[in-house]
């Protein structure tokens, strides 16, 4: 093993791998896939490796073997504890020809050295807090929102006018320069007047219309309109109003509350009390997030650290993959998401990069706080957290442990305790 220090941020380790070690890993790689291999003339799982290689080639086996070798050498370096690394090392100077010729070959691993963090002030930080008070007005607004969900619609008469909050059922066709445009036509469209769902000015001009009436509505698309070709364009919409419906909000009574079958609330008084407690809990949660943000911003400002771009890039890739997985669960792609929000690749990449930078800063600073304060996480706390997660997600503890390695959970708990310590030592400004 040869070691080369490039600078304070990078260290390279070089290894020589014998053909014997390579062959051992190739055999191991094939044994892993052998049970699934099917070739005519052989029983499934009993295909000789030579036959497999002649039919499908060796690339996959070499790739798997190299991955195992890299992991082995990586662990060897970590066990030496010569330095603290961040992220995954990069494979460098791989002699691929000798590798695929089953000869002794060499390769290197380039590690990013964990940056040094100099903490200045981290205890006694000054923070601000809001008064945690829930007003009767806030409770009333929340309950009104609940009542609106129980709203029924009643049709207005032929002579009634269209008013604010009414639901209009209408056809429309839009024209720019006397020509219809894509997306500018709809039949039996339903719109709550005053909701602001349409282009500014559209809903205002519909006020006062009667059922059966046709009217031209003139608007100008805003400069930031999502359909770029229509931005700043003047348009005329021919609107035919078919039906007007008005919302009927039920009266708040004990009987209504009972009919809603809410948890811990069967009377108006209980509903008000529960609503107040819910709003208070939300405010406490929001305040907690606000305090954490204040503390982290001050810690970053009060710290000296230089983060290698490679680490930020690795975290950026991780964040993007994680986000794409979340979108996939909602049957969305990243491209669809960007199109929906009207953002381009550059803006999306910038957002991921900024978040990655913040994540790494937070991790390094909290690790330094934990080290300076000699914080530790007991096995009891780890097991308790596993149990809490099991109860929350209603899955067995063993399944939680499979998805969340103890090392990762321990690190997360340590970061949380470090942050909690700094917050508890903070001073609230008066």
From Swiss-Prot:
Subcellular location per the Swiss-Prot or TrEMBL entry: Cytoplasm
An annotated GO BP: protein unfolding
Positions of disulphide bridges: none
Residues of the signal peptide: none
Enzyme class: isomerase
Domain (PPIase FKBP-type): residue spans on this chain: 165-250
PROSITE patterns according to UniProt: FKBP_PPIASE
Cellular component, GO annotation: cytoplasm
EC numbers: 5.2.1.8
Family: Belongs to the FKBP-type PPIase family. Tig subfamily.
Function, as annotated: Involved in protein export. Acts as a chaperone by maintaining the newly synthesized protein in an open conformation. Functions as a peptidyl-prolyl cis-trans isomerase.
NCBIfam families membership: tig
Domain note: Consists of 3 domains; the N-terminus binds the ribosome, the middle domain has PPIase activity, while the C-terminus has intrinsic chaperone activity on its own.
Official protein name in the record: Trigger factor
Source organism of the structure: Onion yellows phytoplasma (strain OY-M)
């Amino acid at each position: 093993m040869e070691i080369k220090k490039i600078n304070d941020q990078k260290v390279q380790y070089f290894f020589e791998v014998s053909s014997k070690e390579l062959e051992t890993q190739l055999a191991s790689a094939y044994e892993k896939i052998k049970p699934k291999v099917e070739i005519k003339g052989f029983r499934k799982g009993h295909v000789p490796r030579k036959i497999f290689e002649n039919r499908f080639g060796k690339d996959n086996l070499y790739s798997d073997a190299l991955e195992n070798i890299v992991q082995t050498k990586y662990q060897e370096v970590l066990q030496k504890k010569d330095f603290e690394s961040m992220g995954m090392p990069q494979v460098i100077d791989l002699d691929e020809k000798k590798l695929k010729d089953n000869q002794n070959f060499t390769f290197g691993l380039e590690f990013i050295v964990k940056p040094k963090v100099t903490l200045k002030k981290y205890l006694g930080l000054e923070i601000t807090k809001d008064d945690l008070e829930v007003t009767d007005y806030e409770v009333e607004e929340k309950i009104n929102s609940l009542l609106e969900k129980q709203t029924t619609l009643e049709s207005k008469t032929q002579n009634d006018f269209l008013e604010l909050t009414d639901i209009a059922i209408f056809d429309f066709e839009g024209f720019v320069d006397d020509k219809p445009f894509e997306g500018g036509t709809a039949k039996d469209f339903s719109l709550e007047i005053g909701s602001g769902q349409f282009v500014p000015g559209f809903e205002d001009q519909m006020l006062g219309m009667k059922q059966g009436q046709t009217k031209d509505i003139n608007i100008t698309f805003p400069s930031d309109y999502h359909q770029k070709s229509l931005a700043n364009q003047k348009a005329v919409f021919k609107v035919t109003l078919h039906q007007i419906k008005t919302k009927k909000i039920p009266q708040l009574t004990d009987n209504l509350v009972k009919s809603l079958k809410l948890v811990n609330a069967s009377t108006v008084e209980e509903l008000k009390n529960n609503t107040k407690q819910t709003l208070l809990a939300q405010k406490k949660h929001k305040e907690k997030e606000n305090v954490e943000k204040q503390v982290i911003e001050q810690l970053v400002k009060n710290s000296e650290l230089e983060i290698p771009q490679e680490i930020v890039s690795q975290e950026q890739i991780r964040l993007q993959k994680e986000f794409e997985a979340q979108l996939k669960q909602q049957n969305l792609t990243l491209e669809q998401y960007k199109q929906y929000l009207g953002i381009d690749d550059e803006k999306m990449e910038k957002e991921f990069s900024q978040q990655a930078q913040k994540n790494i800063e937070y991790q390094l600073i909290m690790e330094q706080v934990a080290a300076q304060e000699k914080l530790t996480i007991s096995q009891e706390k780890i097991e308790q957290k596993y149990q809490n997660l099991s109860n929350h997600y209603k899955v067995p503890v063993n399944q939680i442990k499979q998805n969340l390695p103890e090392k990762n959970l321990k690190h997360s708990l340590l970061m949380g305790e470090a942050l909690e310590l700094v917050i508890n030592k903070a001073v609230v400004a008066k």
